[in-house]
Amino acid sequence: MRLDDISKFMEQAGIPGRDEYALTPSRKRFPDGASYRIEMSGVEGPKVLEALIDERRKRNVPVHRLVSMCQGGTLFDKQELRDFAQMATEDKMEVVMVPGPRNAWDIGRQLMTSEGARCGASHHRGSDELRKVIADIMRMYDVGIRGFLIVDTGLLWLLKKMQNQGNFPKDVALKLSVWTGVSSPAGAKLAEELGATSFNPIADLTLPQLAAIRKVVDIPIDFYIWTFESYGGPNRLYDAPEVARLYSPCYFKFEPAPSAGGFYSPFTSDESHITLMRKKVKWAEFVIDLIRENQPDMKVSEQGPADLCIPRV
């Protein structure tokens, strides 16, 4: 079969037959009319959030979403979670918390091998693990958190099913993690149809690949500006103006560190997280200034837009 014929059949299924080499600008926007927002990952507890808030106010940098407790919400007590929720509410930021830790904290070891990790390493193993992660989500919801990072498409499907049956809250953000490996328009369409409120594709896609993904989905896309050295460490600061133009609405996501496993650990000091968080806010300021200079029509949301799932305390 000719490649052009396959492209035609893909188009009939609602998927671009080629990557978007024309780099057509996106006309989609956030509800407030903005093209992009700022997401900070690795906000590991109240002390780190306090430093983030202090730094963003000094620099007058809006921060809209916090991917938080990446080492696992289980490791924080309810008072820490309440304090975190209170601070985020007062500064009008959405909190997306990471349930767990899960994988490698049970008996499964396949994911710890270089080849075994290719086989759905982020997915929850068995019904018991699904039950535990949902319980962890509800523990955080009960103290006011309304956003959660989902690392398993099966769990996302289950949560949406439970929502429809009235057994899981609907006033939440369900962000699909980069660990699910979304890397094509078909994968992006599946994420949207399963009920993700936003999703994080892999970090090293080209601009034409990204633009093709944007054509098929309306939900916000979470774009890695900078990520772990262990992920290859792609730094895409200077891609930001074009990404805002092509990929709107999008979150620019800042998560540089040596590795996820090493940095998101209860053995890493608050001081290390605080130092890096202040730098992340500085780099967000650079990105906003770069977009203003090169794509002045691409607007960033003000602090605290109304559609965020800000904690309820």
Locate the predicted segments by residue.
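Hydrophobic, aromatic-enriched interface-forming segments
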Residues: 194-197
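Active-site pocket-lining/capping segments in soluble small-molecule metabolic enzymes
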Residues: 1-145, 150-182, 200, 207-313
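Short, glycine/polar-rich helix-capping loops at beta-to-alpha or helix-loop-helix junctions
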Residues: 183-187
